[in-house]
Amino acid sequence: DDLFLQAGKAYARMRPLTVHRNPEHWYDLGEATQRPLAELDVVLMRKDPPVDAEFINAVHLLGFAEREGVLVVNPTAALLQCNEKLFAQQFPQCCAPTVVASRDDVLRAFHAEHGDVIFKPLDGMGGTGIFHIGPDGRNIGAVIEQLTLRGQRQIMAQRYLPEIKDGDTRILLVDGEPVPFGLARIPSAGETRGNLAAGGRGVSRELTERDHWLIQQVQPMIREKGLIFVGLDVIGDYITEINVTSPTCVREIDDQRGTDISGMLLDAIERRLA
């Protein structure tokens, strides 16, 4: 609600921000001022999904500032084009068997073929709305009905990857280059979701040869779209999502590995501004 458009120019209510390394009191905000976004050098778009109408409207407003020369990270065109779950499907060689549909018969046929399937919405985050349906198909009708809103909304069905027990690994790319360590988000007991927001624990690990191959597959398009900060989600040998809205796990990797991912990102931004 701080963004608005007037006479063809994007404005925002802004406050200076000071960040502290104290989980009990980790930031301070200064006095609010109302200014045109064109006065800024950079805007970091870090609004979390869902990518709903309000998210899309905010991106469109940032596009007005972008056209006045402000660097928006990530670029507005890429944010509008790259649904985080569908974007990965542009690299089928990197993905587990997947179907996207709203039709009950298509989703049931996929489950019948693969037996063990994850169903999830296309616009969620943090493991919300994710269901695991086993070979017995128990509750499949209720899950499909709930997620598709009785056939009115497209959802994703993906073959279940048992490697999730070893973690859903977040791999961060800064200006197309990978951070050398990922964060394996390991599900808690009885869970199939590794997301930290769903109770998973994060363990940093070095990237594997397969990870580097996956990165090489997506790098050209990521660079072509001007994406500066990207998070790949990898389970076993497969990419499950390509996060472009608000990639996380920076602090967890930095704390375990002594890296400075924020510094890498700011260096990349400064290179774009030079």
Language-model features: where?
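Flexible, glycine/proline-enriched loop segments at strand-loop-helix junctions
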Residues: 46-53, 92-101, 130-131
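Phosphate-binding site of ATP-dependent enzymes
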Residues: 105, 112-116, 123-214, 222
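Short glycine-enriched loops at secondary-structure junctions
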Residues: 76-80, 185-187, 235-238
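Hydrophobic alpha-helical segments and helix pairs
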Residues: 69-119
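ATP-binding N-terminal substructure of ATP-dependent carboxylate-amine bond-forming enzymes
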Residues: 1-71, 78
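ATP-dependent carboxylate activation and anion-phosphoryl transfer catalytic cores
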Residues: 189-190, 206-274
